[in-house]
Amino acid sequence: MNYILDNNTIETINNTYLTIHTNIIEKLNFFIEKKSIPHIIFYGPSGSGKRYILNNFLNKIYNNNKQIIKEYVMYVNCAHSKGIRFIRDELKFFAKTNIQNQNGLFFKSIVLFNAGNLTTDAQSALRRCIEQFSHTTRFFIIIEDTNLLLKPILSRFCNIHIPLPIIDNNRISLHNIQKKIV
């Protein structure tokens, strides 16, 4: 079922995502306050707001500075044939350097979408990369099913489940919302 909504309603739903997931947002804010941000896996059904919540989290970490985010956050969609060579070369090269932002947090961020599509060898290389560069880089994974990841990767991450929000006794997915053309 698709919902056709106007721009004001879509903004309300976007704010509702943050309202519904307050316990998750509070946990993420706690990490920022303590300046102790772990590697995090956001998992849950498609359309639950995982990407939205992560982007808000990264904006808070980097003080909404789009230039810093562009320079120090790497987004990777693993559904596009990313293998062990990509992990060993490009991802490792990005992770090598460190930074300091205004909050005193010393790290770059790598966001991996659909990491379950990585081969077993690529996931093993990712695990080694996480171990080697955890002092300069934080890894964030967005995935629907954590069973697709190797257990050694799961054990190095804080796992946060993002359920579909329920609004008016209906589960609402962002994928089922279309903007009303005015």
Where are the language model's segments positioned?
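P-loop/Walker A NTP-binding region and its immediately flanking N-terminal helices
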Residues: M1-V182
